[in-house]
């Protein structure tokens, strides 16, 4: 007897609307002959570090909940962008495509809204969709050449000082090129997907998702010569933290990650995994910039979370 196909649901259990939708979809998929596996976005949350416990994490390929594996053809994400980022971290090692439904605020990474969920699922089950691949980064922390922490990020990795501490001097090496010194409050290493997140707020450029690059953006640099840098994602990057600070904080996709001590190395490269997004309509990145961020609109206009003409 053949096993039933799998369907995954990852939802933000803090939001009642997402929890209700998860229950409705479970019944819908079961009626369609699927085995349904549920989990929350908490599985992809990296936790809150403490200086005396810097390795509070799970290895990259062990974040997924039971039932989420290569045999799962898709998973539904119910939440905002934070839930999507956490879900991507969980399922990327198994190449599971995600259909993302917004129950949050911005919804920059989501495909549809909650009031569109049932026709969206019908379209999905009919196989009428395309896949859009997004690159990720793999972040590893080494201490005395020993790996102590690792994680995936879809948006960015941020290494920054704690509040009320002085300016930092980061030594950064890209590929085999000379090490550069960056005097700043922190540095951001972002993917094209992350170019519309923290990197944008720090003065970085918007990069379309299909471009195979990474970007290095200083946070509040103390130099007129310090500018963001876009480079090929075939290059790896190593950040040496400053020696005049007891510790720094490394965070990924807005999550706490771990503390970085003097002498540690933060090594970042394009991940061998990817995030696969299910698209029910051909993606239109520039329309999304206009809708969500107000790109190209008159300065008196404000972006709305609705489709604009």
UniProtKB/Swiss-Prot annotation:
The active site is at residue 81. One of its GO terms (cellular component) is cytoplasm. Its EC number is 2.7.1.23. Its main location: cytoplasm. It catalyses: NAD(+) + ATP = ADP + NADP(+) + H(+). Keywords: ATP-binding, Cytoplasm, Kinase, NAD, NADP, Nucleotide-binding, Transferase. One of its GO terms (biological process) is NAD metabolic process. One of its GO terms (molecular function) is NAD binding. The keyword NADP applies. It is found in: Cytoplasm. Belongs to the NAD kinase family. Involved in the regulation of the intracellular balance of NAD and NADP, and is a key enzyme in the biosynthesis of NADP. Catalyzes specifically the phosphorylation on 2'-hydroxyl of the adenosine moiety of NAD to yield NADP. This is NAD kinase 2. It comes from Gloeobacter violaceus (strain ATCC 29082 / PCC 7421).
